[in-house]
């Protein structure tokens, strides 16, 4: 996710209510970025970053669409400034993608056989006792 660049105009009304949570998530993101990755697989080093990015976008999504606690102006400000991922939120609004973990899991061009990620397979269609872990973001199943 790009570094937050605040525009010249001040944030809209209600920013002070969500700012502490966003600052806390930013701090977690910095810790995840500087965390040593010795002993981890190459792909595992990015999993905490994907998780925090998901949390931040889900926080803004829930405040606006579920709890209706923030204004449209503040929501659009968060999307414009890169605080939340607008493409991920757009997918969450579509049926079947409500719990999507990251956009890489639905991109078919990155796979050998042109399919979705293993975490997108419903648990009912997997073998009993099989532990699924997404290679991209570490998700254990976001399809339900």
Curated annotation (Swiss-Prot):
A motif (Nuclear localization signal) lies at residues 2-10. GO terms for biological process: mRNA splicing, via spliceosome. It holds the Pfam family BUD31. The keyword tRNA-binding does not apply. Keywords: Nucleus. It is found in: Nucleus. Belongs to the BUD31 (G10) family. This is Protein BUD31 homolog. It comes from Branchiostoma belcheri.
